Amino acid sequence: MLRNSIAPSRGLGSLARQRLTTSGRNLITKRSYVKGKSAAWPPGRSIASVLPARKTSCATFTTSATRGNEQNIRSPPSPSSASAISPEGISKPASSSPAGQTSPGSSVNSPEPPKAQTSAPPPPPPPPPPAPKAKGRFGRSLLYLVLTAGVAYAGGVWFSLRSDNFHDFFTEYVPYGEEAVLYFEELDFRRRFPNATRHINTRPAAPRDEGEKVTIPSKSGVSWKVAENEGTSDVTHKGRHMSAVDAEVPRTGGDAKSAPNKPTTEDKKDSEKTGSKKDESKERVPVTDTKKSTVSLDEPRKPAVATVASIEPLASLQDDPIIQELTKIVNGLIAVINADESASKLAAPIAKAKDDFLKLGEQISSIKKEAHAAAQEEIKNAHKEFERSATELVRRIDEVRSEEAAEYREEFETEREKLANSYQEKIKTEVERANAVAEQRLRNELVEQAIELNRKFLSDVDTLVEKERQGRFSKLSELSAQVAELEKLTAGWNEVIGANLTTQQLQVAVDAVHSALESESMPRPFINELLAVKSLAGQDPIVNAAISSINPTAYQRGIPSTAQIIDRFRRVANEVRKASLLPEDAGVASHATSYLMSKVMFKKEASSSGDDVESILTRTEKLLEQGNLDDAAREMNALRGWSKLLSKDWLADVRRVLEVRQALEVCFLSLLPTLSLLIYYNEC
């Protein structure tokens, strides 16, 4: 009987758990696109896991028909309840000793090394370990058998609480199986419904009339079928199953006016909500007697059986077919209980179960709303995250574009420098070729001139020879002298031609150095030009000494032009004016005072007698404008203190320029003897 009362609770729990799991899966499916980022509903977790355990008594009592309908479906007692048997209750088999070890281990100390200069005898060897006691195989096998049987028996009891088919097999064929299963079911029932047994024990037993015989027809009672129509039964339709009062019971007084099968107000409301469908199936109603009995009006009327109204469909879950099906099943149970004579005993538990069922529906509705709100919130968060990611992506794209633009700009500058260098090399090559062509042309002209002179000489010789012949070899000595003179003249002309070529080449090299110094806007090295001058000068000591006197920094880094020197002097002059009033041991206050006083000082005109800083700067600027760098450097060298310290770099640059110019002038002056010789020979 206790098992029959627990079975419907398992059926209701199975349907409720199936409904909650389906709702949880639907919600998880709707939010699958934020599955990786959302931690609110992780995969594999259903809404049933967050529902609190509820103590319900709506499924405590049922009939054998409901159990027969769900004989192949057995579920845990409730969605939140665990197994009645804890894993700690199962004993573990004792661990056996290793098979390879037949004796207990013994510890033997390692022998110590022999000590020097000792005559003590070695210690005696340790005694052998005692032989192990033989263990009985029979006792071990019996222990394993007992443990295995206990584990199998406990597992059978646990699985019987989960499966109906195994429950029937276990209780029928295993000794004491039914008592063990009923014991654990009763424990589980008392744990879930602690007040149920107390109410049953305290309720007074109804007097039973066992004197009369009650005959039950063959087709009376509750059938396992809820409805015999094509579809499922709907408890919201009007019919005989909506009333537990027999239609054949006579009424007296005011109760006789109303028909026994007239639907109640709740039935009318239910029928208005679900529509006016006609019930095409015939419900089997329990009948205690097929014949109508006549009752006199003087007989006292039996008290009316208190019935429980059916559950109205939940308005918030009308679109959920599983909840509606569960409502129909519960209403069917209520109708069956109302049709029983002992319905008054079950009215309070059924009413409480009805209230719990309605609360469960409201809780499911609230959980669905919360899940929907959480899903909407996660969708908004996902949109915000997407917008943030898009903004970050745009920012990264802009950064990449700016980096690429910088790289392209750098490549452009590099290519431009390469093109400029290549054009400079081309120009240099063209100049060298033009110089080579000019030199070759000059050489050709000199050769032609020499040939012409030789031709003229030969013609003169022929003429003289003819005259001599005509004069019968007169003046032969004079002719020989003239020939010797002509030979000397020819040799001199050859020397003049070689010197002329060397002089021209050296002059071109010196001019190239001058052009390299004056044509560039920025100082550049002129090592190649100096090497050309030195190679053309050969062993000339004057040119070699002049080139050696040049500072290597000058031809390695280049020297500034006159315009650059003047421009830099103006900047240096401003700084010198600011520090003109400073003594040699000036501090921070002196520097600040000198800086302020330099703002109000007037620029003086050039004075030949002034020794102050402003006069020196003015004279130096005038000399620089006239191109006299030597005197300008002498004037700036006359400064003292901070002024001279500030102009130190400028003086160094001017000295390098003067050294280079002086060396070039020396190289040019070395060409003067050759030029004078050329002029002399030309005059001759």
UniProtKB/Swiss-Prot annotation:
Polar residues compositional bias, start-end: 61-74, 93-110
Principal location listed in the UniProt entry: mitochondrion
Annotated InterPro entries: MIC60 (IPR019133)
Function recorded in the entry: Component of the MICOS complex, a large protein complex of the mitochondrial inner membrane that plays crucial roles in the maintenance of crista junctions, inner membrane architecture, and formation of contact sites to the outer membrane. Plays a role in keeping cristae membranes connected to the inner boundary membrane. Also promotes protein import via the mitochondrial intermembrane space assembly (MIA) pathway.
GO BP, one annotated term: cristae formation
Protein's name according to its UniProt entry: MICOS complex subunit MIC60
Region annotated Disordered, chain positions: 61-135, 200-301
Membrane-spanning ranges: 141-161
Residue runs in coiled coils: 367-445
Subunit and interaction comment: Component of the mitochondrial contact site and cristae organizing system (MICOS) complex.
Localization, UniProt: Mitochondrion inner membrane
